[in-house]
């Protein structure tokens, strides 16, 4: 079994580069192989940038999922932040930290999952770095663009707004609880871009740490409270029915969009037609200290510390 230490840094970089199409896209002026990537941005656009760290033992466990699945989830988690801003993706940077004795096949499958998932969503891998470390980890930086001043933001909510969420929640948490992760969500990139044109759109955030936790972040940024109806929260299908309510409320890694709309804006049916996705109204924003009301005691969400 060949290990990373058997091939060295530059050979490993070359092997990862082979996972990327030689012509990554018209917006990529310079891709992998130079000191930095060069990406084209249209006139009248703002650059959107986000970074996520994905660390073995904290964010993924290779005894519960394949390296490729872990890599796919890392890419989706980073791209989902672009979706929450309503941005179109431009490129992805990957900083990979690898223990020297890691099997080469493990690292390449992990990178293959990242590069493949990014390409699937129109986001070429355009550069990065490889370093030695004690634990396998990936730090991804996603770059996107949005019309100047038109990015969706989590601080645009107002008391009286109605709250909506796309898709269904809880499947990723359900699989983690069972010790076998196979499901990989999808970043709602197209839906985020379409949301920017919705009349009365308020705040927006992606559901990465759990519905309740992320709604709490939206409330803090917008300086409002929220009240949700747990019975209306859409729960993902599971064997024998639906995932438990607590996992839909606090599970995390759903990568759906949670957003608010002014009272005079469209309802769930019109939003479904606009976004091309299931959309459910789950509550509203209210005046008051930043907190989520209406939930049973217990559900919180993922925390790094």
Cite the ranges covered by each PLM segment.
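Short pre-catalytic strand/loop immediately N-terminal to key active-site residues, enriched for Gly-Thr
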Residues: 65-69, 179-185, 202-203, 245-247
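Glycine-/charge-enriched secondary-structure boundary and capping motifs
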Residues: 1-24, 45, 65, 99-124, ...
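Short, acidic (Asp/Glu-rich) active-site segment that either coordinates a divalent metal cofactor
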Residues: 51, 151-194
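A short, polar/proline- and glycine-enriched secondary-structure boundary/capping micro-motif
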Residues: 58-61, 175-176, 300-305
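Short, acidic Gly/Pro/Ser/Thr-rich loop/turn segments
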Residues: 45-46, 55-57, 147, 170-173, ...
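Short glycine-/acidic-enriched loop or helix-start segments at secondary-structure transitions
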Residues: 60, 137, 174-175, 268-270
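Glycine-rich phosphate/pyrophosphate-binding loop regions near the starts of catalytic domains
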Residues: 11-165
